[in-house]
Amino acid sequence: MTSMILAVFIFLLTLVLVIWQPKNLSIGWSACGGAVLALIAGVVNFHDVLTVTGIVWNATLAFVAIILISLILDNIGFFEWAALHMAKAAKGYGVRMFVYVSLLGAIVAALFANDGAALILTPIVLAMVRALHFNEKLVFPFIIASGFIADTTSLPFVVSNLVNIVSADYFHITFIDYASRMVVPYLFSLLASIIVLYLFFRKSIPKRYDLTEVKKPVEAIKDQNMFRLSWYILGLLLIGYFASEFFSIPVSVVAGSIAIIFLIAAQKSPAVHTKKVVKEAPWAIVFFSIGMYVVVYGVRNAGLTDVLSDVIQAAADQGLFAGTIGMGFIAAILSSIMNNLPTVMIDALAIAGTDTHGMMREALIYANVIGSDLGPKITPIGSLATLLWLHVLSHKGMKISWGTYFKTGIILTIPTLLITLVGLYIWLLIIHSCF
């Protein structure tokens, strides 16, 4: 009983420090501090630390590499170029631009992770719609769409979200196996997200805008040579992802190698300050992931994940549909309350403790990922990316209160989550009946 109380106390204390970040305390320090406390208290041992490090090292380093690549692309104007093309392609129609910007966000989230989409694309979209002289009421839908779509469409590939990488690594799921299960739910989520966003904001989206106010996409490019090279880098990255499975190469090695090549090339570019790019990379995530997982392992050692295993087992016993929907909403609710990274870790441990196999086990694993990817949009504390996204927006004069965020988030997230989980359920039935 004492170890259980200690494990819960250390977990909650670490979580509060991570979310609150008093005096700008790094999330890495908070999580590692919690891990040290867990070691001192005896709720984990050094063998647990080694086990955890073995689980998360690939995930975190791959994530850092993807963000490094996206930061270089941002520096050379790649994402602004893409956003301006969307605005031009919409030909002055507001709703069309709203949809196109959402589609761009979905592509960026899929290839460059949700954090890259939310933190890089949102300021570009904000600057673009302000340049079109939209008032704040008309700007709001585009900003929320950029942030919302970044998480709801970060499903299709292992590298699209740190949550995905952590879960795939824990259950030893390869890049192709993961994509084969999640690309279809991703399409469900994308379609549902755009429909829900449009229905919610339809009265606030301008019918028309002045196309002459949109600058030429080519003007956004700050280095033509690096811009041309970036297409080869992206092609190499995609080939590397798929090839990694056949050669049993960790995704982090593929992404990391390409990030290093891109960084070396960027040193010659006047548009990219490589030292600044390296400094801006989310290195704290490495220490946060290891430290937080150690703390979560303490909760597991205390037997609390067994309780969650029983709840998940009860849902699974009701059949595939109930198991899929139940697991997804459990993950979403927990993510919205205590952040999605600890949630996906705890849920993975709990799923491993259930008596499930085959299609049911797959449904639980992928529903957990979906819930942990989408659930954070319900509350501002659901993900670190959302907290940082709100902070970036406030610095650019776009303040969104937690109340406004929650009211908007819960209305948008619940139907999107349900539709995506139904998509997963249908796709798993098709896969297992046809192949």
From Swiss-Prot:
Chief place where the protein resides: membrane
Pfam families: ArsB
Keyword Repressor among record annotations: no
Annotated compartments: Cell membrane
Domain of life: Bacteria
CDD domains: ArsB_permease (cd01118)
MF annotations from Gene Ontology: arsenite transmembrane transporter activity
Membrane topology, from the record: Multi-pass membrane protein
Keywords: Arsenical resistance, Cell membrane, Membrane, Transmembrane, Transmembrane helix
InterPro entries found in the cross-reference section: Arsenical_pump_ArsB
Gene Ontology annotations of biological process type: response to arsenic-containing substance
Annotated transmembrane regions: 1-21, 26-46, 52-72, 92-113, 117-134, 139-159, 181-201, 225-245, 246-266, 277-297, 319-339, 410-430
GO CC list: plasma membrane
Family the entry assigns: Belongs to the ArsB family.
NCBIfam families: 2a45, PRK15445.1
Designated name of the protein: Putative arsenical pump membrane protein YdfA
Organism expressing this protein natively: Bacillus subtilis (strain 168)
High-level lineage: Bacteria, Bacillati, Bacillota, Bacilli, Bacillales
